[in-house]
Amino acid sequence: FEDFTPGGTNSGLANFLVGLPDTFFQAPAAPSNIRTKATYIFGQDEWHVANNLVLTYGLRYEYSTPKSDTQGRTFSIVPGAQSTVFPGAPVGLLFPGDKGAPTGSNFPDRNDFAPRFGFAWQPFKNTRTSLRGGFGVFYDVLKAEDNFQFNGQIPFASSAFIGFDGTGVAGPFGFFSDPFGSTGSPNPFPSKPIDHSVDFASTFGPFGGGGVFFVDPHLRTPYTYQYNLNIEREIARKLTLQVAYVGSSSHGLTGLKDINPFDPATLGTANPTRILNETPGNTSSSFSFLPQFMNVANANYNSLQFSLRQQTAKVPVLGSMYYTFAYTYAHTIDFASGFRNNNSQVPFFLPQIFRSSSDFDLRHVITFNGGWDLPFNHGPEKLVKGWSLFPIVTWRTGYPFSVTAGLPASTSQPGPSGAGDRQLVNADQIAPIHYLSGNTSQKVNGTSGFFLFDPSAFSDSPTPPYGTAARNAFRLPGRTNMDLSLVKNTPIHGDRVSVRLNVDAFNIFNHTQFRSVSTNASSNIFGQVTSAYDPRVLQLGAHIIF
């Protein structure tokens, strides 16, 4: 019931009271009965080659049966194949039981062997230096969410969505008495047994669309190589320095790709055609857009890590303390940084241009944390003893971001690689980016606001296919933060009962730190701050420990 219902009252509430709907949707209960079985086998051994050298090695095997529905309610795209289970299905759409179709969402992957190897070596007799390293293969678990996309889809279940037009309708109550007849729509309810002779073209129209997701029948389990090498040296009593290289390389990562985009040669014409077309040049294709989960991406992470760790020790005058100082220089690269976010769609054409820094890439991170038992010795013992201070200090560079052209995902206006990737089109960068502080309101190009960068460096008229501004080519401001906890421990009954009081301060200096900016080149707040991290937060706590 909307305010703008055609022929309505211009009030959603009034339309509801008189029974004048704008749209009507009905769907049956369509439970998913997805089943899978997992088997994991592993073996590991440790070999003490010498007093100063230990080798650890092992092998793991994993197998998960492809997820299947107990009622066979899945389907696959296999171009050129005709279904015998549903003879009226378009060529290329197969179901369990068809030749060339998996019994579930995909064919089995029985190649998931995962070797592991590690070593620890003390090269010098004084045992103050250690060299360690390791390598391993790790397999992911395919998301069950991929299979839930079949839930409630045709031809296994029927649903109805009706948009009403008030023009020429005799009376509003006619909508409710016969919602299907009043609009000329067939009534699919009550649900009937599946008709395997149904003609898809005349009954359902082009198969696919926004509510239908497919799984590549040859989908494989994503896997990651992880490796590290580190050297640790005790440079003083209870003071240890560690330098490490840590990396990983992920392959066969799953992502969405529209496997039926419009033919680039026909884009911009009055009647563009899709690449899966029984009759080339025919604009009435049997398929709409077909988003499919596929092994379409990879990622890697490389880092150099330093740490200096002081174990608890008594320092003259200052008392007992410990701390860890750490610095990480790292780089994470991928094609897409997660499912269902802005760039989760992997383009059919030119996917390589989206390989760049990950959305969560942090190039430099410095942290310091520790504990200090305050050496108060003068005064009543229960009052001056038991005080401790715990600081956490963090400094890091900012996250990357992309400047988009502001084109929403659309099925009627596809992007360069079909439906779902229109929002991947970036703006054109026409000048070097000029970063601003964002701390005070200022006028930029005649617009006042809290700007983090000058928007005049970009144009919202992108150069085909995806604009000239690369993915994640720009950086948000870094972050400097300090949290501090003051703790008082007081024994009440010997060592059996004690009271702990603590005061915690997060962002103790109340430093304004921006976390996001408008990156839509078509927005009227483009380039302006949209959110910040929390200001100072104080927390008081009391605990009885027994």
Regions found by a protein language model. Name each.
Residues 1-27, 76-89, 152-205, 428-455:
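Core domains of carbohydrate- and sulfate-ester-processing enzymes
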Residues 1-124, 341-344:
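Signature of Gram-negative outer-membrane beta-barrel scaffolds
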Residues 35, 52, 64-66, 186-546:
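Short, solvent-exposed micro-motifs at the edges of structured domains
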Residues 59-72, 134-142, 246-249, 328:
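Short, solvent-exposed turn/loop segments enriched in Gly/Ser/Thr/Pro and often Arg
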Residues 105-144, 223, 357-378, 383:
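Repeat-solenoid scaffold signature
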Residues 128-167, 251-257, 390-397, 402:
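Surface-exposed extracellular loop regions of Gram-negative outer-membrane beta-barrel proteins
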